């Protein structure tokens, strides 16, 4: 089992450690509900050092990476980032990732821990013959997610400069206690905040400082409930290698107007012309039962889809779920049933996200 540089500090902070994608990670500290509310109301910090961080370097690196993703990377420049997906030839999703444009010759990508090895091998296979160098920038480093309404203010006090000019999906190099920090205004919670890449020792020091200052340490459990309230996708649940962006609510990432070939383009063009047979929807459960991954979704007693993710929403105080259902049943307001432990529970198709922060 792999350990991040913050493993012992997470245990010291009361973290309950569990296996996750080959790593031993904290699933919770004080408790999921308390951590969830801390991020929604104040500020929380997550150890996400298990995620893959690759640095791609070489002449025209962004143009070469363009052939692997369906999103137009020419829309971003240095200091900006794009959320996108890697596709296979059938248009299925290999992984979702964020592409950070550092310069004309350098791009940083952050990928999921469970897909990191396969993503890295495939990206190398595709890009190294084109003269792109692919390296694991993380290499024992720390990746922290500082999230919540107070996150930006706390980071400003630590680095001694205003971050008001950094837009959502923008990034900047900072210095904290003399140590370089790559800071991106991104996150997986539906709140404002930054994700911070730094060395192991600097990351350990920053973790201690944040906890001493009253920031709540948060685990994978709260990370999942927060992202689900914000209707953010989880790879392996809400999308996978057999699901295209058009089928899982990520069609906005697909820019077919680009006169550029990319892996999976032909399949997506065909789906666009013919339409899709299934769509991802948000469900609000009418009772208190919680729908979980792979629970059947029914209409008039017939199976019409499956739940991809589900939880009890601490903010909304009722169960919510994402589900892949027959396309003709994806209309807002449609009433469906979810089979939960042998009982059919009523649910209604609602607008995503379930929660949207104010301001």
From Swiss-Prot:
Q: Which Gene3D superfamilies match?
A: Aminomethyltransferase beta-barrel domains, Aminomethyltransferase fragment, Probable tRNA modification gtpase trme, domain 1
Enzyme class per UniProt:
transferase
- Per the UniProt entry, the signal peptide is none
From the record, what ranges are coiled-coil?
none
Q: What EC number(s) is this enzyme filed under?
A: 2.1.2.10
InterPro entries, per the entry: GCS_T (IPR006223), GCS_T_bac (IPR022903), GCST_C (IPR013977), GCV_T_N (IPR006222), GcvT/YgfZ/DmdA (IPR028896), GcvT/YgfZ_C (IPR029043), TrmE/GcvT_dom1 (IPR027266)
Give me the reactions it catalyses. Answer: N(6)-[(R)-S(8)-aminomethyldihydrolipoyl]-L-lysyl-[protein] + (6S)-5,6,7,8-tetrahydrofolate = N(6)-[(R)-dihydrolipoyl]-L-lysyl-[protein] + (6R)-5,10-methylene-5,6,7,8-tetrahydrofolate + NH4(+)
User: GO CC: one term?
Assistant: cytosol
Q: Name one GO biological process term.
A: glycine decarboxylation via glycine cleavage system
Q: Name one GO molecular function term.
A: transaminase activity
Q: Which UniProt keywords apply?
A: Aminotransferase, Transferase
Tell me its family.
Answer: Belongs to the GcvT family.
The record's note on quaternary structure and interaction partners says: The glycine cleavage system is composed of four proteins: P, T, L and H.
Q: What does this protein do?
A: The glycine cleavage system catalyzes the degradation of glycine.
Query: Can you name this protein?
Result: Aminomethyltransferase
Please state the gene responsible for encoding this protein: gcvT
């Amino acid at each position: 089992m792999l350990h991040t540089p913050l493993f012992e500090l997470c245990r010291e902070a009361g973290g309950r450690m569990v296996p996750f994608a080959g790593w031993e990670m904290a699933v919770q500290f004080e408790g999921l509900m308390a951590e969830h509310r801390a991020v929604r109301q104040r500020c929380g910090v997550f150890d996400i050092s298990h995620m893959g961080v690759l640095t791609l370097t070489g002449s025209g690196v962004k143009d070469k990476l363009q052939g692997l993703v369906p999103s137009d990377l020419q829309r971003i420049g240095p200091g900006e980032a794009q959320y996108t997906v890697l596709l296979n030839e059938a248009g299925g999703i290999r992984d979702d990732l964020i592409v950070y444009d550092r310069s004309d010759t350098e791009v940083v990508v952050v990928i999921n821990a469970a897909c990191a090895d396969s993503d890295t091998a495939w990206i190398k296979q595709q890009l190294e013959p084109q003269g792109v160098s692919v390296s694991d920038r993380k290499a024992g480093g720390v990746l922290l997610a500082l999230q919540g309404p107070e996150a930006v203010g706390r980071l400003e006090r630590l680095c001694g400069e205003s971050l008001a000019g950094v837009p959502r999906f923008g990034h900047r190099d900072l210095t904290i206690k003399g140590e370089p920090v790559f800071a991106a205004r991104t996150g997986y919670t539906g709140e404002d905040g930054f994700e911070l890449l730094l060395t192991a020792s600097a990351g350990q020091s920053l973790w201690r400082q944040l906890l001493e200052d009253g920031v709540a340490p948060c685990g994978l459990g709260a990370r999942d409930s927060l992202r689900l309230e914000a209707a953010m996708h989880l790879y392996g649940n809400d999308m996978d290698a057999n699901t295209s962006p058009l089928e899982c609510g990520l069609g906005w990432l697909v820019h077919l107007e680009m006169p550029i070939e990319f892996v999976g383009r032909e399949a997506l063009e065909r789906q666009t012309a013919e339409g899709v047979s299934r769509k991802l929807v948000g469900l609000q459960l009418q009772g208190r039962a919680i729908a979980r991954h792979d629970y059947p979704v029914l209409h008039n007693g017939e199976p019409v889809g499956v739940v991809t993710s589900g939880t009890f929403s601490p903010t909304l105080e009722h169960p919510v779920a994402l589900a892949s259902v027959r396309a003709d049943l994806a209309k807002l307001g449609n009433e469906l049933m979810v089979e939960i432990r042998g009982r059919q529970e009523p649910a209604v198709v609602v607008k995503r996200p379930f929660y949207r922060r104010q301001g």
